[in-house]
Amino acid sequence: MPIITRLPDSVANKISAGEVVQRPASVVKELLENAIDAGATKISVTIKDAGKELIRIADNGVGMNRDDALLCVERFATSKIKSADDLDALHTLGFRGEALASICSVSHFELKTRQADATLGLLFRYDGGSLVEELEVQAEQGTSFSVRNLFYNVPARRKFLKSNATEYHHLFEIVKSFTLAYPEIEWRMVNDDEELFNFKNNDVLERLNFYYGDDFASSLIEVAEQNDYLPIHGYLGKPALQKKRKLEQYFFINRRLVQNRMLLQAVQQAYGDLLVERQTPFVLLFLTIDPSRIDVNVHPAKLEIRFDDERQVRSMFYPVIKRAVQLHDFSTNISVIEPFASASEPFVGSSSQPIFSSTSSQAPRMGGGSRRFDLSDAPERAITKNELYRNYREGAFSSPSVASYDAPSPLQQGGLFALASAEESLFGAQAVHEASENIEAFQLSPLDNIVEHKEVEPKIWQLHNKYLICQIKTGLMIIDQHVAHERVLYERALEVMQQNVPNAQQLLFPQKVEFRAWEYEVFEEIRDDLYRLGFNVRLFGNRTVMIEGVPQDVKSGSEVTILQDMITQYQENATKLKLERRDNLAKSYSCRNAIMTGQKLSMEEMRSLIDNLFATREPYTCPHGRPIIIKLSLDQLDKMFGRK
């Protein structure tokens, strides 16, 4: 007697449904793909009870005749491909012919359809995959799928569905991704009898503003790259829009939403230090590639893809993202996000909400006529580092018709990272003697192009010995002095180590350091790079060393503390962040050696710090991703004071 038997189709469909239909969001995705493949220009999504009670997708596509309508719910029935070779030339979202059969088998399923030349439409009702009713009915052109009581006949699957809030979140994210990928389609969504949106225009930026807030689109970097192999277009978020949710990173390949680790890592690396630890930037990118170069038949959900030559794709993708990131000003703006209160209403009201708060992509609006300001990075326009520096230099003049300034380059400064002698640099002993008393804790390299006449210098104030407030041509610029100096020291340290020329000043009296066992192990690991950085250290007994020279920007008397703190910071970074050795060392050095909050600076020190900051590659964030610069425009001030 045979033991192996062929499963009935009803059982097989339920089993395959476990792969294709994992939750209500899976149903929505499959049905939306069918609607788009049918050439729809209008699609409506109706949901009840987070999709557990009802999912209805209606479109105005081509519709189906009776034979196709009956066949579409059979396994492996599809109009998308005819042979395996067609998989190499896919121009549709669906292709397997499994989804409708799987959905139909685990729900009360209804299909209504009418073609353009038909007088009446057709209605088919299924219970658990079995046809129970067929009717001719009045219907609009196109197709409507209604899925009721999902998993009603698979209680184990229904039991493992999450809360309505969770299931609705997944479902809404799927719908949102399609509305962004297909702006030419009119989209309408209704949840529990409440209309959520009804998009009739084809502006993807307006849709982004709807989802994330009115100023969101102005905070994006546009990406556009045309080539024969991998055209790329879309938008990238500025660092202040960082979110931990990966659903806010949308990669569409041939307009199919995909997940690909290489693309994620390439974007992350392109942003580099602009990102705060464990955060990711907002991404909405569309990539077009020959269908024969990708494999979308990797997983039943069709979210994963493989490239035939991933290395080549990355070599073309990464430079585009890196270039887009480098060409934009990432300084933070303070922007007004609520209209000004009317004269009859209080300015702030009784709300306990702070007037200034961090940006949130889903921040609730404040009612009662109250007004709220937001720390966002929405600029009036995207500007470059040089333009921001000119804005700062021209802030000293009341008239805009003044000579332009370019951001200082390393060459203009005699080398920002140049290995100047003690007599040539403010880091030298002679300069320390001649400088003001306020310069004891740090020194910065002089600039060859500092303007000689004080009356044309930018106006700078130090606030609470923590922030530098600068008048710029368009308003105000606020700089965190600690992280600004940290950025300068970080890039200088990397350059010095790469040049492999020790940048040390010898100590008159060598300093002894006794390490603990683990500290000495770390010291041995980074000993060569410490020497390149400028630490001239000689072994002196068991786990003991003598510091005979240090980098020129190490404060006298802090040599031992700096070295010990660096080693501690290095170990912490190695454990948490998995950084490359020199990058880790540069971060540790700059963090421990930068000027501190509470330290008073002279006017010359403040000017030198700002000029050195704008000579760096990334003046907007510290090596750990914290913002350095915040801007407040005159226009924003006028709005805050009700002048506009």
From Swiss-Prot:
GO terms for biological process: mismatch repair. One of its GO terms (cellular component) is mismatch repair complex. Pfam families: DNA_mis_repair, HATPase_c_3, MutL_C. Keywords: DNA damage, DNA repair. PROSITE patterns: DNA_MISMATCH_REPAIR_1. Coiled coil: none annotated. It comes from the Bacteria. InterPro entries: DNA_mismatch_repair_CS, DNA_mismatch_repair_MutL, DNA_mismatch_S5_2-like, HATPase_C_sf, MutL/Mlh/PMS, MutL/Mlh/Pms-like, MutL_C, MutL_C_dimsub. One of its GO terms (molecular function) is ATP binding. This protein is involved in the repair of mismatches in DNA. It is required for dam-dependent methyl-directed DNA mismatch repair. May act as a 'molecular matchmaker', a protein that promotes the formation of a stable complex between two or more DNA-binding proteins in an ATP-dependent manner without itself being part of a final effector complex. This is DNA mismatch repair protein MutL. The gene is mutL.
